[in-house]
Amino acid sequence: MLEELKEDYIHGTVCHDCFRWEQQDSWANTLDHNISFYKYDTFLKNLMARYKYRGDYAIADLFAKDIKIALSKSKVDYIVPIPLSEERLLERGFNQSEALIRKAMLKPTNLLVRIHTEKQSKKSRKERMDLDNIFQLQQAVNVKDKNIFLVDDIYTTGSTLRHASKTLRSAGANYVSSVTVAR
C-alpha cells in the first residue's frame, strides 16, 4: 500500500501518518509497525459495515488468509484483538477483530479491556488523538519481553492501535505491531 502513495506522503519506509505519530514524544516508539491489506475505499467501507453492523460474520473469511500469512512471518507470543466495550459487543454480538483472528485459524489472546466506551467513529481526528488511555491490561497478565500483534479491522487515525500498544509497552512488552484489514 505504501507504494500507492505519492512521494510527498512517504517518509523513508513509513507513511506520513506514522511519521507524524513518531514526531510526538508521548507516542514515539509506541507501535513498531502496522500492516494494512486494503485501501479503505467506498467498496471496503460498505463491506466492513455489513460485517460489523449487520452481522455478516462470513465476510471475515475474505481476510483470513492475509492475516494468517502476515502473522506467520513474525515471531509472535500473543495475537491480541482490539477489544470492544461491553455495549458494542452486545450491539454486534461478536468482536470483529477477534473473529478475524479465529477465521485465520489463529488463537486470539484477550490481554486488553476497553475502559472508555464512546464511539471512536463519532470523534474527530484531534479528539481521538487527545483521548486519555482507553485500555487497561487484564489482571494477572505478564507481557514482559513478549512480542505482540494487535489485530483490528480498520486503521483510521491510528489512535486506537497506539493506545493499545502504549498499554502493552507500559507493562513491559518487547515488540508491538498491528495488522488491520483496511486503511
Model regions and ranges:
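Glycine-rich phosphate/pyrophosphate-handling loop used in enzymes and phosphotransfer proteins
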Residues: M1-R183
